[in-house]
């Protein structure tokens, strides 16, 4: 879904709060090895690298991995989340899938989780809900673009993001996650650039033969003020977290 927009993805995708990974690391039984599955351009990997002795980060997209930051203790591998032969049995202390699990074949992924998880390992599926702008007028334009203009072009599994993964199959006893959100100060073009990473925008271009982003840009320009004005933009975080046997 993301290979053809890998550079834009790494440029515009928002970063997670470091305290989220501090929280997850404190839950892990040890800090020897973390697995970031469906790592994309390494948005979560960079945080895990400072907290664990080793990190293995996997993604099926080589284009995405090519944009990921390099660390001495991180190994990147082109592999699907459902099959990570680079990982040994019962070796991983923390398994993270950040904004990725809704793409997985979950029964096969959970089988792989059970194979690689160390005793008492933690599994955390992280998602951020759809973008919100604090300015209500600008937010109304963005929500109209999301819910009307490109809504028909989202993959079916997108609804899992909108429910904060509560609709996702998760056959484990759960632990609550921290109450956090991603928050940035963005100008108009950053909001438009971020929207350009949406898989629905890519599918709109493919099926309609034109780019929908000018629709969003025109709408935001009419209400934004100076284009380089910064507006608070945020994504509420949601989780499914468990401790494995």
Descriptions of predicted regions:
Residues 32, 53, 93:
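Conserved acidic residues
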Residues 35, 41-84:
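Class I SAM-dependent methyltransferase SAM/SAH-binding core
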Residues 119-185:
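Conserved catalytic/acceptor-binding region of the Class I
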């Amino acid at each position: 879904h993301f290979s053809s927009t890998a550079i834009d993805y790494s440029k515009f995708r928002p970063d997670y709060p470091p305290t989220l990974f501090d929280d997850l690391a404190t839950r892990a039984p040890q800090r020897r090895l973390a697995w970031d599955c469906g790592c994309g351009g390494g948005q979560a990997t960079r945080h895990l690298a400072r907290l664990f002795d080793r990190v293995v980060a996997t993604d099926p997209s080589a284009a995405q991995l090519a944009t990921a930051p390099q660390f001495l203790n991180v190994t990147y591998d082109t592999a699907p989340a459902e099959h990570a032969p680079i990982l040994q049995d019962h070796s991983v202390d923390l398994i993270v899938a950040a904004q990725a699990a809704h793409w997985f074949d979950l029964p096969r992924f959970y089988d792989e989780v059970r194979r690689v998880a160390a005793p008492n390992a933690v599994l955390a599926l992280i998602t951020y809900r759809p973008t919100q702008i604090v300015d209500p007028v600008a937010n109304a334009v963005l929500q109209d673009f999301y819910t009307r203009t490109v809504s028909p072009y989202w993959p079916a599994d997108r609804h899992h993001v909108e429910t904060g993964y509560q609709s996702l199959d998760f056959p484990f006893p759960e632990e609550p996650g921290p109450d956090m959100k991603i928050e940035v100060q963005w100008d108009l073009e950053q909001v438009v650039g971020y929207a350009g990473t949406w898989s629905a925008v890519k599918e709109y271009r493919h099926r309609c033969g034109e780019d929908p982003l000018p629709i969003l840009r025109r709408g935001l320009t009419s209400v934004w003020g100076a284009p380089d004005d910064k507006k608070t933009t945020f994504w509420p975080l949601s989780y499914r977290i468990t401790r494995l046997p």
